[in-house]
Amino acid sequence: MTLYEELQARGLVAQITDNEIIDLINNGKATFYIGFDCTADSLTAGHFMALTLMKRLQMAGNKPIALIGGGTTMIGDPSGRTDMRKMLTKEDIAHNAACFKKQMEKFIDFSDDKALMLNNADWLLNLNYVELLRDVGACFSVNNMLRAKCYEQRMERGLSFLEFNYMIMQSYDFYYMFQHYGCNMQFGGDDQWSNMLGGTELIRRKLGKDAYAMTITLLTDSQGKKMGKTAGNAVWLDPNKTSPFEFYQYWRNVGDADVMKCIRMLTFLPLEQIDEMSTWKDQRLNEAKEILAYELTSMVHGKEEAERAQAAARALFGGAAMDTEHMPSTQLTEADLTDGSIGILTLMVKAGLAASNGEARRLVVQGGVLADGEKVAAPTVSFTAEQLKKGVVIKKGKKVYHKVTL
């Protein structure tokens, strides 16, 4: 099986600009890039598709370029957005880029020039605006840009001229790297298709040469929602933002309808093994979820942390003695207490178990909250400083555990 055939079998290929792509990646002749706008100081589970794709392609002899969007982050990509992104300072972007590289090195081998990490601020921030309009802007049709899917959602709410330039900036990235780094391919999410076509067309018009683009399938659940968030919050690759246990539990709790799709798209397990697992039903689906969670946690946090997270999860949900060492936790201070105690509703909000007192109240009234194994009888229940110093384990629903201490 060729690399391209494997990518298809794993459900990763969405669109390609040209069949020439197949020969390039199969023969290890692609120098390709994927862009990462550094809008936070950590990558998320939503970046998994891109990171694992880069690893697969590099293993086949292709050369990855991880492009940090130091310049484009200052504009903000409107793709898939209904509002304008927060503007970041140069210092914020530099810090975020450094954090990204550390995490990417777990997937990509940057040694001996096997891969590059570039920052488009190095060329975008030095551009002369008049020259850009004359040399690059002339290659773009405003009519075509307005028809692009990435701008559709923003037109009614208002699209700033700043964001309207994003397609030109991304296209210029490809054009610049084609000339200076031999980059002949771009990969990205399926929502980036219009921006990517802009780059291949700019290279064709300015240089008379061919460049290629392929979009990868967006990772969505059976309801069509993007995966990589829990309770509205991102699942981070940084262990200080999302602990290895929480990370493990996110993947352990994916829906029955989504587990095999995630295994196929995100792990490096052989396709033959995955095909066999696809026949699993009922309780064996839980085994598949454990495999998924272990494989991904191992990739991000290492085998030791994956084993510890798996052991802790089995102890929590398997009826064994409770292991709270790796459980998500919140440490309160005396300032969080009122007259030496804290109510269950306030505690749940501070621990991130509920978005508001109202939501916490509803969960308690419905009987979905336990404290140290006992059902919380009423929304008026409170915990003393003495109890909190020993640690209180809150259970929400069937699978969410959280330790609160003082």
Model-derived features: positions:
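Conserved nucleotide- and phosphate/pyrophosphate-binding catalytic cores
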Residues: I203-L406
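Buried hydrophobic packing segments
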Residues: A50-L57, M177, N195-I203, L296, ...
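N-terminal catalytic cores of NTP/NDP-binding nucleotidyl/phosphoryl-transfer enzymes
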Residues: I21-P78, Q186-W193
